[in-house]
Amino acid sequence: MKIVGLIREYDNKITSKSYKEYKKNCLYIDKQEILNYLNKGISIAATMNVVKSLAINDNSIIGGINYMTDGYWIWPNYIVYYFKKESIELPTEFIEYILKKKLPCINEINKDEAIDFLKRNI
């Protein structure tokens, strides 16, 4: 299991980067396909923390933090917001995985493993 897309302003963990450290306006040829994949992740945890956008001149409320998975990768819902709005940078390994896999496929074992992994790392 791997975690991707943590933003320090929301998730202050060792593996997180500050919003300002993420490259914006990245060119993704398959952006819609990647966005569809991210949106189809299975929710494995949710918080009551309401988060606002960190983007300049954007006062949008993103909502509560939800952690999604495909059974191997785990990502927070707010990274989907920034990917759609600003084409925020995602790791090449993650993008290649998405484009090869096409659609998330998860079973209960994967879901339980993802939940356990998240508990240990968040």
Q: Where do the protein language model's features map onto the residues?
A:
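Alpha-helical interaction/linker modules in multidomain eukaryotic proteins
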Residues: M1-I122
